[in-house]
């Protein structure tokens, strides 16, 4: 695809805060190569470290930023704003302001389908996602198809339809994606450099603008995280084997989320992670009591929970910042669950998802991983994937009894993932470049950014779902038109 052919050609693009590391700097190079004029605002020395040239340094207060933003958009005649995380204080007003001014907004976020994807959506992500708003229409399309009763997902995460081999849906990118590999240490390296630079430059910038503390203490918490990782590896030796052996199919896995993640603070009704832990324990204790009372009616497909336990898994990125051991012990005693609760840290998550009886979470993207491994999932908050046929739709109080009969439908899950990838995901990582891709940012773009920011009104087919409908009205995967020049490394389609 030539530069002139790119929808970004002639566009004026504003980059606000991006992920830690050089991703936004490299993306700016790709945008310029496509013919766009790029403007960048830095808010702290960490931003400056990875994007030092041709930028605007903002060092005022949050209120001053709110006053400056509309002036900046007007002064530079901005056509599109790109940012990472739509709930950060400096980004929170961008969506409404841009909508009023007719400016496109593209939001990056960690991938819904990790580790091989990052998220890029117009308008917003998670609870602000357009995909989330259009799920009702998608569900109508699935109802028109009829629920595939013969197919379900077994505990190995494979389709169990007679004679049917599991495969990615036609027209999706699932079968064509490139594996990213483990990029934990890449992200950790960029993160440490970012926070150290931000702390070192605190005299020259207003670090209070950042959504997390940028102090020397925060750096110490990251050092504490590495120390705790080694400590828990020693103290929790043997836990993985116990869960995969003695307790296999007898434990419910509860993945905890980062304490100040917007998924908790903005997109859930829980005041804190501790509030969620309390809710889960109270419900499970009630289920144990309910089973022992004959007058209490149990669900139709109820199975005993008397031999089951709860396993709370700490989020690895929150290891140095929070420790819920004391709260877990207190709540365990309060709800009479002694001997039925484990609090763990760094076990191999995919193996746990395969071995557990079910998964309970607020709205973490771990839920999609769990579904992929065939685990029944109960969502206690608001999540994109919390739809009938994929997750358990009943009450948490009943999930404990009905988990084994709440396996996700394989065909439904495949259709959903195909739509999710096509509409919201980009193959790659913010922290580690995919080898061999044509874009300096290291993510496989293939024209998808422009398509999502400025969707064409053309009619597109929905493979395996329904006849043709308007592109803006369908969540079904777009029909593949074969590899473009960008796919082969000859172009720069964004």
Model-derived features with residue positions:
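Active-site and donor-binding regions of nucleotide-sugar-utilizing enzymes
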Residues: 20-26, 43-137, 159, 367
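Alpha-helical membrane-targeting segments
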Residues: 123-127, 168-241
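Active-site donor-nucleotide binding/catalytic segment of nucleotide-sugar enzymes
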Residues: 16-20, 245-277, 281-282, 288-298, ...
């Amino acid at each position: 695809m030539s530069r002139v052919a790119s929808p970004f050609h002639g566009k004026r693009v504003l980059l606000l805060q991006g992920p830690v590391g050089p991703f936004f700097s490299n993306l700016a190079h790709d945008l310029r190569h496509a013919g766009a004029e790029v403007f960048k605002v830095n808010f702290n020395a960490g931003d400056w470290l990875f994007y030092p040239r041709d930028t605007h340094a903002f060092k005022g207060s949050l209120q001053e930023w709110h006053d400056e933003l509309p002036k900046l958009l007007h002064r530079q005649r901005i056509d599109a704003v790109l940012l990472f995380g739509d709930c950060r204080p400096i980004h929170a007003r961008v969506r409404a302001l841009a909508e009023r001014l007719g400016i496109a907004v593209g939001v990056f976020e960690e991938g819904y389908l990790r580790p091989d994807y990052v998220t890029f959506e117009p308008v917003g992500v998670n609870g602000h996602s357009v995909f989330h708003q259009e799920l009702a229409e998608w569900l109508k399309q699935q109802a028109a198809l009829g629920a595939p009763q013969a197919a379900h997902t077994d505990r190995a995460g494979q389709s169990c339809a007679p004679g049917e081999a599991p495969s990615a849906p036609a027209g999706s990118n699932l079968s064509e994606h490139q594996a990213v590999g483990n990029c934990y240490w890449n992200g950790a390296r960029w993160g440490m450099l970012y926070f150290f630079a931000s702390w070192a430059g605190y005299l020259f910038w207003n670090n209070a603008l950042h959504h997390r503390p940028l102090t020397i203490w925060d750096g110490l918490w990251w050092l504490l995280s590495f120390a705790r990782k080694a400590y828990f590896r020693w103290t929790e030796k043997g836990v993985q084997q116990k869960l995969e052996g003695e307790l296999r199919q007898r434990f419910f896995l509860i993945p905890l989320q980062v304490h100040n993640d917007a998924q908790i603070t903005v997109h859930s009704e829980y005041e804190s992670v501790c509030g969620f832990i309390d809710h889960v324990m109270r419900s499970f204790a009630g289920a144990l009591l309910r089973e022992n009372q004959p007058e209490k009616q149990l669900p139709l497909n109820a199975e005993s929970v008397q031999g089951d336990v709860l396993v709370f898994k700490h989020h690895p990125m929150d290891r140095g910042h929070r420790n819920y051991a004391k709260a877990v012990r207190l709540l365990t005693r309060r709800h009479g669950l002694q001997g039925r609760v484990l609090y763990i840290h760094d076990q191999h998550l995919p193996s746990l998802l395969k071995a557990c009886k079910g998964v309970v979470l607020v709205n973490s993207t771990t839920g999609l991983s769990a579904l992929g491994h065939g685990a029944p999932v109960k969502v206690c908050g608001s999540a994109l994937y919390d739809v009938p046929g994929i997750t358990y739709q009943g009450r948490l109080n009943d999930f404990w009894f009905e988990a084994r009969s709440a396996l996700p439908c394989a065909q439904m899950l495949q259709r959903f993932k195909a739509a999710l990838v096509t509409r919201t995901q980009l193959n790659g990582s913010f922290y580690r470049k995919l080898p061999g891709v044509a874009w300096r940012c290291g993510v496989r773009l293939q024209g998808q950014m422009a398509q999502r920011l400025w969707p064409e009104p053309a009619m597109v087919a929905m493979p395996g779902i329904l006849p043709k409908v308007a592109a803006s009205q369908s969540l079904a995967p777009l029909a593949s038109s074969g590899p473009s020049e960008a796919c082969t490394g000859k172009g720069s389609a964004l």
